[in-house]
Amino acid sequence: MFVRLTLADVKEGEMNNLLNYVKNSVIPSYEGLSGLLGIAACSTEDGKFMAWSTWANEGAKEASIESFNQALAGAMDMLDSKPESMEGPMVAGQTYVLVPKDGEEPFLARFVIGSGTQEGKTYDDVADFMTNTVYPAYESTEGIFAAGACKTGENTGFSFNFWTDTTAVENARPVISEVVSSAVSELISEEPKEYSGVCNIVKNYVDFPVGKLSDLNS
């Protein structure tokens, strides 16, 4: 699996217009793209626009670049500056409940972007930490339904976790804080940046079954 994440600053008063543009224009324009597994967008708690798409592999994502560029061109008048995009293969992931195709229930999306690993560590070490420490810890929480980590470079990447609502995340804060603290002390160079927001715009094209998200690669 391969994920592309886009973050952007939006002109004042344009956020709802931008989200409606994604819902009514971008998502329909992506219909039928080979290898597209899902697409979603939201406004973050600090006022940024955040969108992400999930693909079967990098080749499928690359084949969609014309559609992506057309979507970006249509959004530029609503943006304050050129958006920041990052992408990479999913190197760790888990679903805790079935996420069905065409599921469109609102949820809380939380993305975490690291600044890089400590000397002598790589993002593969981060992936192992996510798989063996973070995901088992999340099993004790209520309201989480998916988590993953994507490698953008030898020492860089981003992770995400999806929750039923804001309350679920706040109740899980002790667990989240503990795993972040462990990551900072053992793996990453400094505390990562978190972006989160309630997502009402989502389109899944496949079921995401309970278990390892990376199994969808096989």
Where do the model's predicted regions map?
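Short S/T/G/P-rich N-terminal loop/turn motif that feeds into the first structured element of a domain
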Residues: 1-50, 54-158, 162-218
